[in-house]
Amino acid sequence: YLNKEIVDEARTFGWDKVVYYEKPLLKKTRQLYAGQYGVALDSKEMPQHHLNQFGIKIDAFVKHHDSHAAAGYYTSGFKDAVILTVDAIGEWETVSISKGYNQKAIERMESIRYPNSLGILYSAFTQRCGLKPAEEEYILMGMAAYGTPKYKDNIYNDFVERKPFRLKRN
């Protein structure tokens, strides 16, 4: 989480509003659905709790994938763009496709929702290889360049329904 040095540096740039990168209550609905009751019901996991110690008030919340899309699009220099966001999970979305218009607006076109997540599948393979999920995926990615895809069809057949994209449940 945040520390004093990071907050002090951010304050040197100034700000008009503090916008948080996900909608915590929407995220908690997904955590409850997934059976993560301890985290979902813990008020210390609410973002404002972490910011109170720095005297910072959150002015607005945006969906996690919208914040990824905005960060990529508004810093890209493109007037119009198609924006692909893929990560383990936002509140519910795991993959989203959006359109950016005239550097003024972003519209969500399609999304894939939890529990269907390429990112979570990738983290599971990371853990299966003895690495730390949500931290060491880059090691697995680097090792992949030296392997051969001899188990690719088995992985697809065992874990993935292709149309529409879904992860098989066990």
Annotate each predicted stretch with a short phrase.
Residues Y1-N170:
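Short acidic/glycine-rich loops and adjacent helix/strand connectors
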